[in-house]
Amino acid sequence: SIANPILMDKLPWELKDLTPIGLITVATNVIAVHPSIPVNTLKEFIAWAKQNPGKLNYASQGNGSVSHIGTEIFKQQTGVEMTHVPYKGSGQAIQDVLAGQVQVFITTPPSVMGHVLSGKLKALAVTGKTRHPQLPQVPTVAEAGLSGFELESWVALYVANGTPKEVVQKLSNDVKRAMEQADTKQRADAAGVEVRYLTPDATTKLLERDTASWAKAIKAANIKFD
């Protein structure tokens, strides 16, 4: 996790010791709210939240989790006030959101898709570059009118520094070919993730961008691991 080097003082590895082969998959998130919140769009939600400060709680999978840091970034970019309620995983968090004890949860689409389709939760937007194939009716955050906010969990392959450049390039080419195979996309779709290959250089830029964004949010919100 990008958060680990920021939140933890001692790790058995450092990012600077690794060389990227390439990005392989990304997973978006969805901004889900309890239906008692009288909004149907992301713009309406932001406006309502600002008019009703102190009335919203948001769930996360735990301190330092993607949902925690991602929601703090959302708060910082929109000026919305929400109180953090950390859980140990998604199970109890979803149950409390369904019960209305907590009103907001930014989480993975598969974990709330059934509740969205049944009307027990409202999905206001997905946080990636594209719409989620299992929730095609839900707009992206950008489509919903909020620019500059993006929250994707991604997976990349790395090797140790010092690996010969020609080996890194060959591995990257092999990964690219594998990502282009039809069965790879089918398996990714079934898992609820998107195949997205990036070159080693592009992967480095993505890591630098997200690390800077997360570090800023973590510092501003004074986030600590349990």
Features from the language model and the residues they span:
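Short beta-strand->loop
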Residues: 13-24, 59, 81-85, 103-104, ...
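An extracytoplasmic/periplasmic, membrane-proximal ligand-sensing/linker region
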Residues: 77-80, 117, 140-143, 165-226
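Conserved functional loop/turn residues at catalytic and ligand-binding sites
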Residues: 41, 86, 100-101, 120, ...
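Beta->alpha turn/N-cap motifs
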Residues: 1, 90, 107-112, 126-129, ...
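Short helices/loops that flank or line small-molecule/ion binding pockets
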Residues: 73, 77, 91-101, 105, ...
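Non-transmembrane alpha-helical segments in soluble domains
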Residues: 43-46, 94, 98, 106, ...
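Alpha-to-beta junction loops
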Residues: 52-56, 80, 98-107, 120-123, ...
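Hinge/capping helix and adjacent helix->loop/strand transition within the periplasmic-binding protein
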Residues: 2, 6-92, 141, 154-187
